[in-house]
Amino acid sequence: MQLSAPKHAMTHESRLDRLLRQLLWGRRTAALATLQTLPGAETVPFTTPAVSFVPYAIDSTAQVLVLHVSALAAHTRNLRQSPAVSLLITAPEDAAQPVHALERVAIQGQAVLLAPEAAASARAAYLRRFPEAAPMTALGDFQFVQIIPSVGRHVAGFGAARDLSAEELKALLTS
């Protein structure tokens, strides 16, 4: 089910902001990059990127992205070691269009693992987008994670790329 972008109260929104808002609110999955620490050859820890595929929601009140993660997942262990993350959200591929022009946004940020008593807003946002996940939200080994955006890079096509500040990203996460 494709979700449409929320009605936005701004009187004028740039074409690139409109495209990015539609991408963020219209897609439901992202690639999540975390930092994984591996044992080194001489007992020196070695940190390497690790990528997972995750569903995400948007908590427009808190202006964050929301994940629901299992304690068994490698990315959850990684988040406990380092909160630095990157999310990559892409438009669907179109066989008639070059993949190099595929619209996408990479969002760097900090992950905050939420205690159950602090997760009401995140849970509500997640269940609005994924009502079928309600039974999973009651499982004890799952928890909600807020991704607080720091910076981003939006590519809307050839010659249409821009850097985004935390403030610009948060404005696009507001309904």
Q: Over which residues does each language-model region extend?
A:
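Hydrophobic/basic alpha-helical segments enriched in Actinobacteria
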Residues: 22-25, 31, 67, 81-82, ...
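An N-terminal domain-cap segment
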Residues: 2-80
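Structural motif
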Residues: 62-64, 84, 151
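Conserved hydrophobic/aromatic beta-strand scaffold that supports enzyme active sites
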Residues: 31, 51-55, 106-108, 144-146, ...
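Surface loops and adjacent helix of pleckstrin homology
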Residues: 35, 70, 90, 157-159
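Short, structured beta-strand-loop surface elements
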Residues: 43-44, 72-129, 139-142, 149
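C-terminal edge-of-domain segments
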Residues: 2-9, 13, 129-175
